């Protein structure tokens, strides 16, 4: 494997699910903030920025977890922990990607740039929250959802209360899907003393995941209704609810394969919500 391929693996370009989980909430925000008529330049900036910042986050995460990944079956072959990439290289990659992302938003208003600094700090500190915070997935939800206030800021030069409520909804969604992800590694994380929601929730994990899905859809539903979204939006939410119900069938036995499949399937849940939002605006 050549150097470029190793860097691609470091930043998970071969696993786009993480990009999509960041992108969908950002697109919800851009469409709602612009009344369904987003500036396509903004859409391009935020889409590329999502790819860059998710990639930078992966590099920072692998740097932070390099001494733990070697003890986890799923992560033992990651480039840093396997010795194929030096730790300092990962930090350099993260720095370059972050600077590129910041260059993208440089033409935007001051508020968006200020929020981007907060977003970088949150993304960079997330890997360390797993050492002491009982539910780091909630912090991840803030990191993965910070495109929401940034999107509103870029369009409206302000961040209304609705944007923060969408961020809260994204936190619930993140706790749901990343708990599914954490259930895959639960036994390894217990041995390492790592903190995850899958460990914290214990035997109530499945019930709490479903509660978080319900809160996600409920909050988004209320926010969307306030924005005047109606039939197609509701249809999108119902389709997302069907996705969540399907996840229950995958995770109720707590088998690794099913939990991982449910995590990956969240792309469809986020896409269903966006489809409902976009169609409702388009077909008015």
UniProtKB/Swiss-Prot annotation:
Any one Gene Ontology molecular-function term assigned to this protein's record: 4-hydroxybenzoate polyprenyltransferase activity
UniProt-annotated location(s): Cell inner membrane
InterPro entries for this protein: HB_polyprenyltransferase-like, Prenyltransferase, UbiA_prenyltransferase, UbiA_prenylTrfase_CS, UbiA_sf
Bilayer disposition of the protein: Multi-pass membrane protein
Enzyme class: transferase
Domain of life of the native organism: Bacteria
Listed Pfam families: UbiA (PF01040)
Catalytic activity reported: all-trans-octaprenyl diphosphate + 4-hydroxybenzoate = 4-hydroxy-3-(all-trans-octaprenyl)benzoate + diphosphate
Transmembrane feature ranges: 16-36, 40-60, 91-111, 132-152, 157-177, 207-227, 231-251, 259-279
Keyword entries, A-Z: Cell inner membrane, Cell membrane, Magnesium, Membrane, Transferase, Transmembrane, Transmembrane helix, Ubiquinone biosynthesis
Pathway listed: Cofactor biosynthesis; ubiquinone biosynthesis
Record EC number: 2.5.1.39
GO cellular component terms, A-Z: plasma membrane
UniProt key word Phosphoprotein: no
Listed cofactors: Mg(2+)
Family: Belongs to the UbiA prenyltransferase family.
Record protein name field: 4-hydroxybenzoate octaprenyltransferase
Species per Swiss-Prot/TrEMBL record: Janthinobacterium sp. (strain Marseille)
């Amino acid at each position: 494997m050549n150097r470029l391929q190793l860097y691609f693996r470091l930043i998970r370009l071969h696993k786009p699910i993480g990009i999509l989980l960041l992108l969908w909430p950002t697109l919800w925000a851009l469409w709602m903030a612009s009344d369904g008529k987003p500036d396509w330049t903004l859409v391009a900036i935020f889409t590329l920025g999502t790819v860059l910042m998710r990639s930078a986050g992966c590099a920072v995460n692998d740097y932070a977890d390099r001494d733990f990944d070697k003890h986890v079956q799923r992560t033992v072959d990651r480039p840093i922990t396997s010795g194929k990439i030096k730790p300092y290289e990962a930090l350099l990659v993260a720095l370059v990607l972050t600077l590129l992302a910041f260059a993208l938003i440089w033409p935007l208003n001051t508020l968006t740039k200020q929020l981007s600094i907060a977003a970088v700090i949150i993304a960079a500190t997330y890997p360390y929250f797993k050492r002491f915070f009982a539910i780091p997935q909630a912090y991840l939800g803030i990191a993965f959802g910070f495109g929401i206030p940034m999107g509103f800021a870029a369009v409206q030069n302000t961040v209304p209360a609705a944007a923060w409520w969408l961020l809260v909804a994204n936190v619930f969604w993140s706790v749901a899907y990343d708990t599914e992800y954490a259930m895959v590694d639960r036994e390894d994380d217990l041995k390492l003393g790592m903190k995850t929601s899958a460990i914290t929730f214990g035997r109530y994990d499945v019930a709490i995941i479903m509660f978080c899905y319900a809160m996600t859809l409920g909050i988004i539903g209320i926010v969307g209704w306030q924005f005047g979204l109606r039939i197609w939006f509701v249809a999108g939410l119902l389709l997302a609810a069907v996705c969540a119900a399907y996840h229950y069938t995958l995770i109720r036995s707590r088998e690794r394969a099913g939990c991982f499949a449910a995590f990956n399937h969240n792309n469809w849940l986020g896409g269903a919500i966006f489809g409902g939002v976009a169609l409702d605006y388009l077909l008015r």
